[in-house]
Every structure is written in structure tokens, then in C-alpha cells.
Amino acid sequence: MSLLRLWNKESRAPSKIKSHGIVGSYGNSMLAHNNVKQFRIDIDEPHRVWKPNESITGEAVIDIKRDITNVAIKLSLVCEVRVKTGNSPTSKNKRIEKTLEKSTFLYGQDYVKTAFSAKEKKPHVDKTTILNGLSKGEHRFPFRIRIPRGRGMLSSIKFERGSITYFLSCTLESLNNINGLKKPEARCEREFAVIVPLDVSRLPKPKTKTVVLQSASMVQNKKNKSTEDESSSYTQLTQKSTTSNSSSSSVNSKTSPLPNKTVTISVDIPQAGFMIGEIIPIDVKIDHYKPFYAPAGLTTTLVRICRVGGAGKDDPMETFRKDICQSISPIYINPETLQFQSRVYLKVPLDAFSTLTTVGKFFSFQYYIEVMVNLSKKNVVYTESNRIIGTPIGEQNGLGVENNINRIQRKMLRMVNPETLENDSEGYESSIFFKDMVNVEKLKRLRNVTGMSIETVIGTTRSEQQQSDASIPSQSSITAPQNSPSNLRDWLAPLNAYDSDDVPVPKYSPNDKVSVPSEDKQELEQKRLQQLESDPPPCDDY
């Protein structure tokens, strides 16, 4: 008897069915006892990333166990923003807001309009009156809904503290519930991805950012000069009485000038915005007052800053930092010019998302390029795995021959044909680190370390292809001599290959059966010629 009661209790409770990632819930009305067998949304292109002003086509499929009457099927396009706020994991609050909701009826639209008549006081349909119905079995309702466009549209995104989600929601409602006071009888959802294009070609060109460093003695000298200028009116009144004293002080000041200890750091970026997947060229120039060398003196990092708003007005905003990629280069101040110029590269990874600032009350994402300059040889730069960056030259000899071979091959390719590396970013990406990077926050705390931060915009499109260096450095940035094939052969040949004209070089035919790598054929050919030249000439008198 108790088992029968338990069975009746379970049959009365509302049920939830999860099928193909879609959840359908059914209430205790005319569709109770699980009368809907399956309810789902099929999209014609389920894996496509949609853009605003594009139309999504598909069909809503519902499988019913028995005949039902007086129902309507509504399809809605919804954009929902979710964010988790709170410092501790146990006290996280969720904020949910729908920024977009566009609805249309797939079935029963005419009866819904009749029930919502303005003259009718009670929008109620009698249960005995049959307006429409669906028979037992599977029913398919095709649809075509357009994604709106405008300034309020957002790109789909999911991260640890929040998300922007687009989904299609299809509900099966009773005509008695057209006022929305009760929950829908059945519901299913289907998510899809939307990306809002962000054009970076129309952004203004950024100005060169400069940082000037001066010694403490020079700063104190400037303060003294400013105080002297403020008291110039008083000194003019007493100029006649203190002529001798002022002249002697001026002579002393001229004889002991302070040394000019000024360091100027200039950073220039060709554009203010870059696309996802592009390489960012950064020009760095340093004017120093003395020769200087640091093996890990220049650290450039692409940083993403995420700001998450609080649940209330009084709650503080949380800030999270994420280092995307990093490049480390040495600094060498030329003793003659006392200058250093270099171009470093960073890359926007393909899995990055564009800059987002329109959802400021929830969260925002901004990108910055941080350039840190280490002006001290005593500072040791460590990575996250405690690996030292900038080891001496003597310690680098034991790293293996593979890195040296790769560098030689790249140099040879650039000399033979510079275009081979122009479209291949492997040569530039080899100096970009995506893991085991230097902690920039710790680097800032060291002495004689300075830098700057430049905001950049990460977008998705570039309508105007500009001539400046944007994604990949141009051919002019690669300093390679334009050698003709004959000059290149002369350069590759040994010095004594064509000196002796007495001994003729015999002809030979290469063996096609032997598989030799293409890059080593010329080298093997030269060795063979040298061996043949070193053999003694044949003697006919023997």
C-alpha cells in the first residue's frame, strides 16, 4: 500500500526532461502527467556564429502523447547577462538581466489577439470552448527570426564571473494563460553564438608616449632655480648693493655645472586597434646618458583588465588582471650615439575576445600594452617557474645546437627570399611567450625599473587595409640584401673553389635514389667538389 502511495505521489509531481541539452518543464494543468514527450528547437546551422541583422532559420519540434486543445506556441529571442559578485566563494551574488527579448508566435497567434482584445474586460477563454488544438504525434513549426542590430547589441562571452548568452526560447502556453500570470506549460531553449563586429580601422592613430627620468640632484637643482625665479623681484631691488656678490656666485655656478643624467624612453604603436590574431609591432627608443647593457632589460606585455561591478551601489568594483602574452628583449645602449632602438612584437591570440565596455554596470574588458624597462644590471628577472631570464653568454652555449640551427635557417631564408617569412609569422612568434611569463607586478617593485601602459582596442574586423605595419611587419622592416642568384652562389661557394684552373672539374650526375633534404643539397654538392679538386690529376705515363 505504501508503494502505491509513493507511485501516485511521484506521478503528481512536476517533471523535468533533459534532452539534447534542452530542459523542458511541465506544470500540473491540462498538460500534466507528462503529456509532452519531446520538445526541442532545431537550427539549420547550429555551429554558426551569427551577426546582427542576420536571420536564424529552423523549426520547433514537439511530440505530444495525446490530443491537446487551446494552446499557443511562442518563440522568443533573448539576450541574458549574468554576473557573479562577491569577494568570497560562499557569498557570491548573482545578477541576471535580459537586455533583449524579441517574441513571435508560431501557433495560435490569431486566438491570442482575440483574447487580448481591448474591449474584453476578462481575457479568459472558457475551457469548454475549443479554439484550436494539436493532435497526438510529432509537430514541426518552421521559423525565421532576425537578430536585431543597434548600439545595445553585445557579443557572446563566457568567463568565470559572468556571461552574455543568446538563446531561443520556445514555450507551449495555454490560451487561459495569455496574460502570463502562470508559468508556461512547457518550455525549451537553444543557445547560439553572436559576435558584434568591432571595426578597428577608424580609430585615430595614437601619439608617441614618452617617459623622462632624471636624477635626484637634477630635480633638486630645478627646484632651487624655481625658488630663485620667484625671488627675482626682490633681487632686482638690491641689485646695486650686491653686484659683487652676485657676480661671484654666478662665476661659481658656471664653473660647477651638474652632469646631465637624463634617460628618455619613447614608445610608438602604429595603430590604436588590432584584430584578433594579428601581430602588434611596438617601436621602443631609449636615449641614455651612458653606455648600458641589460640582457633582459625590455619586457613588453599584452594585458587584459576585467572590471566586475558590485551587486549594489555601495559595493566596490573588483578588478582582475590577465597577462595574455609577453616578449623580452635585451637593451644595448650604443657607446657612440647613446641610443637604443628596437622593435618588439606581441600577438593577439585567436581565442581572445574583443574589447567590451558597453556593459559597464556589470563587467568590462579592456586591453593594455605594458612596456617595462629595467635600467639596473643588479636586478634579476624571474619567470613564474623561477627561471632566470637573461643568462650570461657563457651559459647559453650548453642550450643545444637546435636553436642555433633554426636561427641560421631563418637568416638564410631571409637572404634568399624575404617574402618567405613575410607571410609566415613563425619568425616573430618565436620571441613571444604565452606561458611561464615574468610577473610584471613584482618587476615594478624593483629599483630602477620604469615603464608605461598604453591602452589598445582589440576588434574583429578591419574595413580599410592600411599601408602601415598592422598585422605582420612589412618587407621594409626586414633588413635583407637583395642578392641575385649568381651573387648568392658566389657567396655560398668556398674561397678556393674557382682558384685553380689547371685541374678541370669532372662532371657528375646526382643519384636520384638517395633522398637528401632540399636545404642540404647545395652543401653536399660543395663538399663533393672540394673532394674532387683535392684528388691528384691522373698520370698517363704510369
Curated annotation (Swiss-Prot):
Residues 214-258, 460-542 are annotated as: Disordered. There is a cross-link at K521 (Glycyl lysine isopeptide (Lys-Gly) (interchain with G-Cter in ubiquitin)). Induction: Expressed under acidic conditions and repressed by the processed, active form of RIM101 under alkaline conditions. Residues 460-487 have a biased composition (Polar residues). SMART domains: Arrestin_C. Residues 235-258 have a biased composition (Low complexity). InterPro entries: Arrestin-like_C, Arrestin-like_N, Arrestin_C-like, Arrestin_domain-protein, Ig_E-set. SUPFAM superfamilies: E set domains. It comes from the Eukaryota. GO terms for biological process: cellular response to amino acid stimulus; ubiquitin-dependent endocytosis. Keywords: Isopeptide bond, Ubl conjugation. The keyword Glycoprotein does not apply. One of its GO terms (molecular function) is protein-macromolecule adaptor activity. One of its GO terms (cellular component) is cytoplasm. Residues 518-530 have a biased composition (Basic and acidic residues). Belongs to the arrestin family. PalF/RIM8 subfamily. Present with 784 molecules/cell in log phase SD medium. Required for the proteolytic cleavage of the transcriptional repressor RIM101 in response to alkaline ambient pH, which is necessary for sporulation and invasive growth. This is pH-response regulator protein palF/RIM8. It comes from Saccharomyces cerevisiae (strain ATCC 204508 / S288c) (Baker's yeast). The gene is RIM8.
